[in-house]
Amino acid sequence: MRQRVKIVIKEEIVRELYVIAGEDAVQTAEPMKNHTTFRVGGPADYFVAPHTEEEIRKIVALCEEKEIPWFVTGNGSNLVVSDEGYHGVILSVYKNFQGIKVEGNRIRAKAGSMLVSISQAAREAGLSGMEFASGIPGTLGGGVRMNAGAYGGEMKDIVQNVTVLTRDGEIRELEKEELGFGYRASVIKDRGYVVLGAELMLVPGDKEEILARMQELKNKRVEKQPLEYPSAGSAFKRPEGYFAGKLVMDAGLSGYAVGGAKVSEKHCGFLINAGGATASDVMELIRQIQAKVKEQFGVQLEPEIQFLGEF
């Protein structure tokens, strides 16, 4: 029998969050399954959707001063939160941080803007270079943080500079060469910075050709990815010299399930919520996949999904 989740709410912290962001922005014991694309996860003690960069800065300062754990989310597309929830502050930089501005060959966007929306804005402006991101179901902030990529393109190819909030409360603009982009990695991720916005550099292109390329990639996704189920996208990073999905398939794990978490039969690189999955199901499924692939092929698969909380 599952134990009841222990929720730790301190009224003085709630009051201080109210003062900073307003009562409408603060929720307590908020189920994180409502804020992740895998649709799993227990309650966050405090869930805050700030309205301004200054509110973010003040909330981070409060958390640092009071030694409260904090974590920033966008639309939760690459995140699995523990069934026990998160004993700290979740900062939702999503709905209140959307905005896209095209200036010549450059696009300036806020962190909560969806990559799909930015790609569409680029197409409408006749700008090419972002077609690869037209189906990535995440925000600009998350995409920059992890150097998201697909179909041969990565965010590092187009990012010119990024506005961040450091953990000590300083708002800085980092140029491309300062971002330390690697495969699903960046300085932003390593140092725990908060992405506030970014400037992207694209190139002029033919609108019809851009649209055709985006449609081609969409058709590939529909054909090969389990878009009809909740998931966290690609489950594993690509091991050098291999494809993660093929290793999982060759290990005989297509359709393999733990509870409601299942290896997609459509694409073995994806784990899906086939119904009623828990975060523990997802974690156990990943562990079993890792063990099986390691045993059969000597390759250690590393999760691309980020896990938050206690497992």
Predicted segment positions?
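Short, well-ordered alpha-helical segments in soluble proteins
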Residues: 122, 140, 144-148, 163-166, ...
